[in-house]
Design a protein with these regions (language model features):
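An extracytoplasmic/periplasmic, membrane-proximal ligand-sensing/linker region
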Residues: 188-190, 293-343
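Extracytoplasmic ligand-binding site segments that recognize negatively charged/polar headgroups
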Residues: 35-42, 65, 79-220
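Periplasmic-binding protein-like
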Residues: 110-114, 159-167, 194-199, 205-206, 237-261, 276-298, ...
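Short, polar/charged alpha-helical segment
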Residues: 31, 35-58, 72
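A ligand-binding cleft/hinge motif common to bilobed small-molecule-binding domains
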Residues: 89-93, 217, 222-240
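A bilobed periplasmic-binding-protein/Venus flytrap-type ligand-binding module shared by bacterial periplasmic
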Residues: 135-140, 179-183, 253-265, 284-285
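Short amphipathic alpha-helical coupling segments at ligand-binding clamshell hinges
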Residues: 44, 190, 194, 255, ...
Length: 343
């Protein structure tokens, strides 16, 4: 009888322990920092929760530059558990500061080699590539007799004076990939000379990478230097836009994922990072991006220019990350006078 009672008690105790541990894990909240487009956050969390309903994502979202600055400021007292959707150049900077937890997620071998940190184990893994593009409002261009630009150099022609908006690279990852890629395409001296000439035609600099294209879509400017995802999405919504891939080539960066060093929720963080490189996740990224971490899964994206993979420059991410501070300081000194007020 004692054995039976002991067995019952043990079973009940085990069930309680299991229930409590399951409830505790079920209550796991992950603080996830991101620069993913705000409209996609609900979808990303919902798809993840289809497979892992026991982990709740609490998003902290802003533009790439602002999220990067926030993470660096919190280095000694990190508040994020995971970074899901931030520029690889930003993560390389944090890797150098010892801020990322090295982890080889399940399925790593299935990723394109460009979409992972070179360290073993890696500190970050890539999701998709976002690429520079020029968003041209055809109605506004016709109204102002503006020819459709086909190159970056075209944007320096006097005819475009006051009709161009682009992102401030101190706030925007898209702005930084533009600036760092121009310095690679044209060379250091040529890149700054190009930006000096472009600055003459800039109406204003924004603090968001998508905003110049959104403004072009609404007819607030004729031309927005932005990224292809936003142009394609605006065009699909009926905006009178052309998405132009400049002939010199385009800068690009990866949206990438990493675990923040020191998280107290490491198991849940690993679960999210594992999921972020699955085929299911990559198919989700492909709903908006033409180039993804598992490229064999990629299907054409509506209104994306066909020549994007060929136009992507051989971007030196290590160089961009190590020179980021210098580049941003120089840009700020030269051009910040035309930046919009920060909201």
């Amino acid at each position: 009888m004692k054995n039976i009672l002991f067995g019952v008690r043990s079973t009940v105790a085990a069930a309680l322990v299991f229930g409590l541990s399951h409830a505790a894990f079920g209550a796991t909240d992950l603080t996830v920092y991101t620069a993913v487009e705000a409209e996609d956050l609900k979808k990303y969390a919902a798809r993840f929760n289809e497979d892992h309903p026991d982990i709740k994502i609490n998003w902290v979202r802003d533009s790439t530059g602002i999220v990067t600055a926030k993470l660096l400021a919190e280095k000694e007292n990190p508040r994020a558990d995971v970074i899901w959707g931030l520029a690889a150049t930003s993560l390389l900077l944090m890797k150098g500061e010892g801020m990322l937890h090295a982890y080889a997620p399940s399925g790593l071998d299935g990723l394109d080699s460009k979409f992972r940190d070179k360290s073993d184990p890696p500190t970050w893994t890539g999701m998709d590539a976002w690429v520079a593009a020029i968003c041209v409002n055809t109605v506004e261009s016709e109204k102002h007799n503006l020819p459709t630009p086909s190159s970056w150099e075209d944007l320096t022609k006097p005819v475009y004076k006051g009709h161009v908006a682009m992102p401030n690279p101190n706030s925007s990852g898209t702005g930084f990939l533009d600036v760092s890629s121009w310095l690679q395409i044209f060379g250091e001296d040529g890149g700054w000379a190009f930006m000096d000439a472009l600055h003459e035609n800039i109406g204003h600099y924004t603090h968001s990478g998508s905003k110049p294209c959104k403004q072009a879509a609404r007819g607030e400017v004729a031309i927005g230097v932005s990224f292809a995802f936003r142009g394609a999405k605006s065009k699909a919504s009926g905006a009178p836009l052309e998405v132009i891939i400049p002939s010199e080539g385009i800068g690009w960066d990866m949206e990438a994922t990493a675990i923040v060093n020191g998280t107290k929720k490491l198991d849940a963080a690993k679960t999210l990072v594992d999921w972020s490189i699955t085929e299911k996740a990559n198919k989700m990224y492909n709903e908006g991006y033409a180039v993804i971490g598992i490229q064999r899964l990629a299907k054409p994206v509506e209104h994306f220019p066909d020549n994007i993979p060929q136009a992507m420059i051989d971007n030196d991410f290590e160089w961009a990350a190590s020179n980021r501070k210098r580049i941003l300081a120089e840009w700020q000194k030269r051009y910040d006078s035309k930046s919009e007020p920060k909201s």
